[in-house]
Amino acid sequence: RDIATSLFVVKALRKKGKKARLLFSWDEFDRLRKVPKNVQEINNDMEKYIGYPYVDVPNPFHDEAQSYAEYFEHEFMRSIDEFGIELDYRYQAQMYRSGKYSEQIIHALKKRGEIFDILDSFRTQDAQPGEREAYYPVSIYCPCCKRDTTKITSLSDDCTQATYTCECGHEGSFDFTKDFNCKLAWKVDWPMRWMYEGVDFEPGGKDHAAPGGS
């Protein structure tokens, strides 16, 4: 439905002589949160990849796809091709890891207090003491264990340099102008992409307007 809704909007705009493109973004840089039952049945060793970005999780289905993410991307694209729908794809792992969002990430870090206040205004529970000061709208993927189980411990005044620790025991520093293996939290990532791509329309469901939704 999401694609169909956007497709009709694009067609209507083009019919009126407007330039319009239909973007489709692969959230392949999100973390693997759990292993679906059908995947577990194929490979019962997949839980060790929880916390990895989807693009770095091995493909358990034994076909030509290079990753867990790519397998489902291929499945989806084959289906879309059958309908003759042309999509302008964005691969978020490539976008992040190429540094294209570096400026936007630093901007979000500079505005982290304001972002926290906006998010906090929709919460049903009061923030804990020190929670605002410890809030960072970005997760760093650990270079040792490859997971996002990291915690930023300090940030430079210009918001370009950070130190962090990981649950695996690794400690390190991160330069947001040179190191790009990090990802914004989804409630910040989503509007960031709108700004970066100049998005004017995106469909949403009632779940997005629910308490705690986007």
Predicted regions and their residues:
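Short, solvent-exposed loop/turn and secondary-structure capping segments
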Residues: 32-35, 120, 153-155
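Short coil/turn segments at secondary-structure boundaries
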Residues: 118-124
